[in-house]
Design a protein with these regions (language model features):
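Membrane-interface helix caps of multi-pass small-molecule transporters
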Residues: 52, 81-85, 107-108
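Loop-to-helix entry region at the N-terminal start of transmembrane alpha-helices
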Residues: 6-14, 130-150
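Alpha-helical transmembrane segments within multi-pass membrane transporters and channels
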Residues: 58-99, 148
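Single conserved hydrophobic/aromatic residue that forms the stacking wall/gate
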Residues: 151-160
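Hydrophobic core segments of alpha-helical transmembrane domains in multi-pass membrane transport
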Residues: 47-51, 102, 143-151
């Protein structure tokens, strides 16, 4: 039974991460009605920037997260410039940016496809250590809080 709970915790932790990317795809495809594939490359760009800053440079995880968000914003801006200034169709601009980001991500990572985060302090490990819980439990709590926050924010306001 404990093996099932550990697997469930891992699945929820990964689901939270992939859910963020799915929200980006949903916003561009459904709400903005633009076929934009940049989110695929920019999601990985943020992860690469954050991992390199935390592992190789020893930067605080919160600051690394903010820099990663800024890198994603720059990637989105490149897509926007390709679409508006150079008048490339949105789907093609997104695909061009996505393909470019694959190479850029490998360059950022120093030619490696991954970096081990096992011995590095992250946001989740800091939270887990502060409250005396495992990292999987901290991931689940963060995921639940984020999900409830997004549900609360996305609900339409009703006049009373």
């Amino acid at each position: 039974m404990s093996g099932l709970l550990v697997s469930l915790q891992g699945a929820v932790a990964q689901g939270v991460l992939w859910g963020i990317m799915v929200l980006g795809v949903y916003i561009t495809f459904r709400l903005m009605n633009i076929a934009d594939m940049t989110v695929d490359g920019s999601f990985a760009l943020g992860a690469c920037v954050c991992a390199v800053l935390v592992v190789n440079k020893g930067v605080n995880p919160v600051l690394a997260l903010l820099v990663a968000v800024a890198a994603g914003v720059v990637a989105g801006a490149v897509t926007g410039i390709l679409h508006t200034v150079f008048e490339i169709p949105a789907i093609l601009a997104g695909i061009l940016t996505q393909i470019s980001l694959w190479s850029i991500n490998l360059r950022i990572m120093g030619g490696k496809s991954n970096l081990p985060l096992l011995k590095v302090k992250t946001l989740i490990s800091g939270l887990a250590a502060s409250f005396g819980m495992t990292q999987a439990q901290a991931s689940m709590i963060v995921g639940i809080v984020l999900a409830l926050s997004l549900i609360h924010i996305s609900e339409p306001t009703r006049p009373y």
